[in-house]
A protein has these predicted regions:
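Residues at the starts of beta-strands that form the adenosine-phosphate
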Residues: 3, 26, 42, 130, ...
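Residues in the short beta-alpha loop(s) of Rossmann-like NAD(P)-binding domains
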Residues: 10, 33, 85, 159-161, ...
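NAD(P)-binding Rossmann-fold cofactor-contacting core
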Residues: 23-34, 150-170
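Rossmann-fold NAD(P)-binding glycine/threonine-rich loop
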Residues: 84-97, 214-260
Length: 263
Protein backbone atom coordinates (compact mmCIF):
# COMPACT_ATOMS: atom_id res chain seq x y z
CA UNK A 1 0.00 0.00 0.00
CA UNK A 2 1.40 3.39 -1.02
CA UNK A 3 1.59 6.07 1.66
CA UNK A 4 0.49 9.62 0.89
CA UNK A 5 1.34 12.43 3.29
CA UNK A 6 -0.84 15.51 2.91
CA UNK A 7 0.73 18.79 3.97
CA UNK A 8 -1.81 21.47 4.79
CA UNK A 9 -5.24 20.93 6.22
CA UNK A 10 -7.87 23.02 4.48
CA UNK A 11 -11.21 21.40 3.76
CA UNK A 12 -10.27 20.61 0.15
CA UNK A 13 -7.26 18.58 1.21
CA UNK A 14 -9.14 16.94 4.08
CA UNK A 15 -11.87 15.82 1.68
CA UNK A 16 -9.30 14.61 -0.85
CA UNK A 17 -7.51 12.64 1.87
CA UNK A 18 -10.70 10.83 2.89
CA UNK A 19 -11.51 9.91 -0.69
CA UNK A 20 -7.96 8.71 -1.34
CA UNK A 21 -8.26 6.43 1.70
CA UNK A 22 -11.38 5.02 0.07
CA UNK A 23 -9.32 4.33 -3.04
CA UNK A 24 -7.06 2.15 -0.92
CA UNK A 25 -4.14 4.47 -0.17
CA UNK A 26 -2.65 4.99 3.27
CA UNK A 27 -3.06 8.72 3.92
CA UNK A 28 -1.64 10.81 6.74
CA UNK A 29 -2.26 14.50 7.52
CA UNK A 30 0.27 15.43 10.21
CA UNK A 31 -0.70 18.41 12.38
CA UNK A 32 2.94 19.44 12.71
CA UNK A 33 4.86 18.00 9.74
CA UNK A 34 8.51 17.12 10.27
CA UNK A 35 11.37 15.56 8.33
CA UNK A 36 10.31 12.03 9.29
CA UNK A 37 6.97 12.60 7.53
CA UNK A 38 8.76 13.53 4.32
CA UNK A 39 11.17 10.60 4.49
CA UNK A 40 8.55 7.93 5.21
CA UNK A 41 6.16 8.79 2.37
CA UNK A 42 5.82 7.50 -1.15
CA UNK A 43 3.91 10.65 -2.11
CA UNK A 44 3.74 14.19 -0.73
CA UNK A 45 0.52 16.02 -1.61
CA UNK A 46 0.98 19.77 -1.23
CA UNK A 47 -1.66 22.52 -1.01
CA UNK A 48 -3.34 24.75 -3.57
CA UNK A 49 -1.30 26.81 -4.28
CA UNK A 50 1.81 25.22 -2.85
CA UNK A 51 3.34 28.59 -1.98
CA UNK A 52 2.46 32.27 -2.08
CA UNK A 53 5.90 33.71 -1.39
CA UNK A 54 8.18 31.22 -3.13
CA UNK A 55 9.80 30.21 0.16
CA UNK A 56 7.22 28.74 2.53
CA UNK A 57 4.35 26.29 2.20
CA UNK A 58 0.92 27.94 1.87
CA UNK A 59 -0.63 26.10 4.80
CA UNK A 60 -2.35 28.57 7.17
CA UNK A 61 -3.79 25.73 9.25
CA UNK A 62 -0.27 24.66 10.26
CA UNK A 63 1.05 26.94 13.00
CA UNK A 64 4.76 26.78 12.19
CA UNK A 65 6.30 27.89 8.92
CA UNK A 66 7.33 25.08 6.62
CA UNK A 67 10.11 26.02 4.25
CA UNK A 68 10.13 24.56 0.75
CA UNK A 69 13.90 24.17 0.96
CA UNK A 70 13.47 21.90 4.01
CA UNK A 71 10.94 19.76 2.15
CA UNK A 72 13.30 19.45 -0.81
CA UNK A 73 16.28 18.59 1.38
CA UNK A 74 14.48 15.97 3.48
CA UNK A 75 12.43 14.23 0.79
CA UNK A 76 14.04 11.13 -0.78
CA UNK A 77 14.58 11.18 -4.53
CA UNK A 78 12.18 8.25 -4.87
CA UNK A 79 9.29 10.17 -3.32
CA UNK A 80 6.81 11.74 -5.73
CA UNK A 81 5.94 15.33 -4.83
CA UNK A 82 2.57 16.58 -6.08
CA UNK A 83 2.60 20.37 -6.03
CA UNK A 84 0.38 23.11 -7.40
CA UNK A 85 1.86 25.95 -9.45
CA UNK A 86 5.34 25.26 -8.11
CA UNK A 87 8.11 22.86 -9.11
CA UNK A 88 10.83 21.36 -6.93
CA UNK A 89 13.84 21.36 -9.22
CA UNK A 90 15.93 18.20 -9.11
CA UNK A 91 13.12 16.26 -7.44
CA UNK A 92 10.54 13.83 -8.72
CA UNK A 93 7.77 16.40 -8.90
CA UNK A 94 4.50 16.81 -10.81
CA UNK A 95 2.59 20.09 -10.84
CA UNK A 96 -1.04 19.00 -10.73
CA UNK A 97 -2.03 22.65 -11.17
CA UNK A 98 -1.00 22.22 -14.81
CA UNK A 99 -3.07 19.06 -15.29
CA UNK A 100 -5.62 19.76 -18.04
CA UNK A 101 -8.39 17.60 -16.60
CA UNK A 102 -7.93 19.07 -13.13
CA UNK A 103 -7.99 22.65 -14.39
CA UNK A 104 -11.06 22.09 -16.53
CA UNK A 105 -13.07 20.43 -13.76
CA UNK A 106 -11.89 23.02 -11.23
CA UNK A 107 -13.23 25.75 -13.51
CA UNK A 108 -16.78 24.64 -12.69
CA UNK A 109 -16.76 25.50 -8.95
CA UNK A 110 -14.79 28.64 -9.83
CA UNK A 111 -17.53 29.75 -12.22
CA UNK A 112 -20.31 28.88 -9.78
CA UNK A 113 -18.55 30.75 -6.99
CA UNK A 114 -18.15 33.81 -9.21
CA UNK A 115 -21.83 33.75 -10.10
CA UNK A 116 -22.76 33.41 -6.43
CA UNK A 117 -20.72 36.54 -5.69
CA UNK A 118 -22.41 38.40 -8.54
CA UNK A 119 -25.88 37.48 -7.29
CA UNK A 120 -24.99 38.51 -3.75
CA UNK A 121 -23.28 41.80 -4.60
CA UNK A 122 -25.62 43.27 -7.24
CA UNK A 123 -29.14 44.71 -6.86
CA UNK A 124 -30.33 43.32 -10.20
CA UNK A 125 -30.85 39.92 -11.77
CA UNK A 126 -28.22 38.30 -13.92
CA UNK A 127 -31.00 37.70 -16.42
CA UNK A 128 -30.89 40.57 -18.88
CA UNK A 129 -27.65 42.01 -17.54
CA UNK A 130 -24.54 42.69 -19.61
CA UNK A 131 -21.59 40.59 -18.47
CA UNK A 132 -18.01 40.96 -19.68
CA UNK A 133 -15.72 37.95 -19.22
CA UNK A 134 -12.07 38.87 -19.72
CA UNK A 135 -10.16 35.83 -20.97
CA UNK A 136 -11.13 32.78 -22.98
CA UNK A 137 -9.36 30.06 -21.02
CA UNK A 138 -10.98 27.21 -19.12
CA UNK A 139 -12.54 29.40 -16.45
CA UNK A 140 -13.64 32.04 -18.93
CA UNK A 141 -15.38 29.53 -21.17
CA UNK A 142 -17.19 27.70 -18.36
CA UNK A 143 -18.22 30.98 -16.76
CA UNK A 144 -19.53 32.40 -20.03
CA UNK A 145 -21.57 29.24 -20.59
CA UNK A 146 -23.17 29.45 -17.14
CA UNK A 147 -23.88 33.18 -17.46
CA UNK A 148 -25.55 32.73 -20.83
CA UNK A 149 -27.71 29.95 -19.38
CA UNK A 150 -28.92 32.44 -16.75
CA UNK A 151 -29.95 34.92 -19.42
CA UNK A 152 -26.96 37.27 -19.43
CA UNK A 153 -25.82 39.07 -22.53
CA UNK A 154 -22.24 37.84 -22.49
CA UNK A 155 -19.15 39.35 -24.08
CA UNK A 156 -15.93 37.32 -23.91
CA UNK A 157 -12.50 38.76 -24.66
CA UNK A 158 -9.66 36.89 -26.33
CA UNK A 159 -6.37 37.41 -28.15
CA UNK A 160 -6.27 34.59 -30.71
CA UNK A 161 -8.28 34.34 -33.94
CA UNK A 162 -9.27 30.76 -33.15
CA UNK A 163 -10.71 31.88 -29.83
CA UNK A 164 -12.76 34.61 -31.50
CA UNK A 165 -14.28 31.97 -33.75
CA UNK A 166 -15.05 29.77 -30.76
CA UNK A 167 -16.65 32.67 -28.88
CA UNK A 168 -18.82 33.59 -31.85
CA UNK A 169 -19.84 29.99 -32.45
CA UNK A 170 -20.96 29.71 -28.82
CA UNK A 171 -23.23 32.72 -29.23
CA UNK A 172 -21.29 35.34 -27.25
CA UNK A 173 -20.18 38.81 -28.27
CA UNK A 174 -16.44 39.16 -28.86
CA UNK A 175 -13.87 41.66 -27.63
CA UNK A 176 -10.13 42.00 -28.07
CA UNK A 177 -8.42 41.76 -24.69
CA UNK A 178 -5.88 44.38 -25.78
CA UNK A 179 -8.77 46.79 -26.43
CA UNK A 180 -10.82 45.92 -23.38
CA UNK A 181 -11.32 49.57 -22.40
CA UNK A 182 -13.68 49.86 -25.39
CA UNK A 183 -16.00 47.25 -23.86
CA UNK A 184 -16.50 48.50 -20.30
CA UNK A 185 -20.08 49.61 -21.01
CA UNK A 186 -21.51 46.65 -19.09
CA UNK A 187 -23.09 45.70 -15.75
CA UNK A 188 -20.66 43.10 -14.40
CA UNK A 189 -17.03 42.28 -15.23
CA UNK A 190 -15.26 39.01 -14.49
CA UNK A 191 -11.49 38.95 -15.01
CA UNK A 192 -9.73 35.60 -15.50
CA UNK A 193 -6.32 36.68 -16.85
CA UNK A 194 -3.14 37.07 -14.80
CA UNK A 195 -1.95 40.38 -16.25
CA UNK A 196 -3.26 43.90 -15.75
CA UNK A 197 -5.75 44.51 -18.55
CA UNK A 198 -7.75 47.44 -17.15
CA UNK A 199 -5.85 50.65 -16.45
CA UNK A 200 -6.87 52.85 -13.53
CA UNK A 201 -8.18 55.66 -15.76
CA UNK A 202 -10.36 53.19 -17.68
CA UNK A 203 -12.68 52.89 -14.68
CA UNK A 204 -13.79 56.51 -15.13
CA UNK A 205 -15.84 55.45 -18.17
CA UNK A 206 -16.83 52.01 -16.85
CA UNK A 207 -20.55 51.50 -16.21
CA UNK A 208 -20.22 48.21 -14.30
CA UNK A 209 -21.41 48.09 -10.70
CA UNK A 210 -19.29 45.02 -9.90
CA UNK A 211 -15.94 43.64 -11.02
CA UNK A 212 -14.73 40.24 -9.82
CA UNK A 213 -11.08 39.20 -10.20
CA UNK A 214 -10.73 35.42 -10.47
CA UNK A 215 -7.05 35.50 -11.41
CA UNK A 216 -4.28 34.69 -8.97
CA UNK A 217 -2.08 37.68 -9.84
CA UNK A 218 -4.72 40.29 -10.54
CA UNK A 219 -5.89 42.08 -13.67
CA UNK A 220 -6.82 45.48 -12.26
CA UNK A 221 -6.36 47.91 -9.37
CA UNK A 222 -9.24 47.26 -6.98
CA UNK A 223 -8.74 50.60 -5.22
CA UNK A 224 -9.07 52.48 -8.51
CA UNK A 225 -12.31 50.64 -9.27
CA UNK A 226 -13.71 51.44 -5.82
CA UNK A 227 -12.79 55.12 -6.23
CA UNK A 228 -15.08 55.19 -9.25
CA UNK A 229 -18.02 53.63 -7.42
CA UNK A 230 -17.48 50.07 -8.61
CA UNK A 231 -17.58 47.21 -6.12
CA UNK A 232 -14.31 45.31 -6.64
CA UNK A 233 -13.79 41.80 -5.30
CA UNK A 234 -10.54 39.85 -5.44
CA UNK A 235 -11.60 36.21 -5.49
CA UNK A 236 -8.76 33.77 -6.27
CA UNK A 237 -9.11 30.19 -5.04
CA UNK A 238 -12.92 30.14 -5.06
CA UNK A 239 -13.32 26.34 -5.28
CA UNK A 240 -11.79 25.84 -1.84
CA UNK A 241 -14.01 28.55 -0.36
CA UNK A 242 -17.39 27.98 -2.00
CA UNK A 243 -17.33 24.27 -2.89
CA UNK A 244 -14.61 22.52 -0.84
CA UNK A 245 -16.36 19.15 -1.07
CA UNK A 246 -16.41 19.17 -4.86
CA UNK A 247 -12.94 20.70 -5.03
CA UNK A 248 -11.63 17.90 -2.82
CA UNK A 249 -13.30 15.25 -4.97
CA UNK A 250 -11.74 16.72 -8.11
CA UNK A 251 -8.31 16.80 -6.46
CA UNK A 252 -8.62 13.20 -5.24
CA UNK A 253 -9.52 11.93 -8.72
CA UNK A 254 -6.64 13.88 -10.22
CA UNK A 255 -4.17 12.46 -7.69
CA UNK A 256 -5.43 8.92 -8.30
CA UNK A 257 -5.04 9.32 -12.07
CA UNK A 258 -1.52 10.73 -11.68
CA UNK A 259 -0.45 7.94 -9.33
CA UNK A 260 -1.90 5.27 -11.60
CA UNK A 261 0.59 6.24 -14.30
CA UNK A 262 3.53 7.36 -12.14
CA UNK A 263 3.85 4.81 -9.32
Amino acid sequence: MKKITVLGGDSRLTTAAEILRGYGYEVDIPAAPCEDDYRSSDVLLLPIPTTRDGETLAAPNIKKKIYLADIARSTPDSTLILSCNYMFEGKRCIDYGKNDAYCLLNAVPTAEGAIALAIEKTPFTLWGSRALVIGCGRVGRILADRLKALGCRVTVSARKLADFALISAAGYYTAKTAEIKKHLNCDIIFNTVDVKVIEDDDFKKCTASLIVDLSSKGGFNAAAAEENGITAIKAPGLPGKTAPQTAGEILARTVRDILTTNL
